[in-house]
Design a protein with these regions (language model features):
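S-adenosyl-L-methionine
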Residues: 11-101
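Conserved class I S-adenosyl-L-methionine
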Residues: 103-108
């Protein structure tokens, strides 16, 4: 796997840069992603009228996949870094984890799916994520009932 050092952490294919994440937080790009949901990501990527078309296409692709794997994340329109999405537990799997207690430590937090569901059964959930960009995802996390 190709790896190169960035100012923040390690960058590898499939990872999202901090700059891309910040772009996805802007109202203009969030609105564009919302307008493109349901379209073919390949068509979006090739559409020269769409600013940041490749980035928008990637988010539309992963939001479409999130409808079944991470429905709360889809509804909240969370930003989904591709590699983190691929490595994430599904909400259905996370909801079935049966442990409970006072405190739990999630050393590979990623998108926080397991932590989100563990928070229903533990008084305190501590999460660690080595990819700084993925850790930004917690700014857009959904809430679950």
């Amino acid at each position: 796997m190709e790896r190169r050092t960035e100012k923040i952490g390690i960058f590898a294919p499939g990872m999202m840069t901090p700059e891309q994440y910040r772009l996805l937080l802007t109202p203009e790009v969030r609105r564009t992603v919302e307008e493109q949901i349901g379209r073919d990501p390949a068509a979006i990527a090739l559409d020269k009228r769409i600013p940041h078309a490749a980035l928008v296409a990637t988010q539309v692709k992963y939001l479409a996949r999130a409808r079944t794997k991470l429905p709360s994340y889809y509804e909240a329109r969370c930003i989904l870094p591709p590699l983190a999405f691929e490595q994430a537990s599904s909400e259905a799997c996370a909801a079935r984890k049966s442990c409970s207690g006072e405190r739990v430590l999630d050393l590979t937090c990623g998108l926080g799916v397991d932590a989100l569901y563990l928070s229903k059964r533990f008084r305190e959930v501590i999460t660690l994520e080595r990819d700084a960009t993925v850790s930004y995802t917690h700014l857009t996390l959904p809430t679950i009932a």
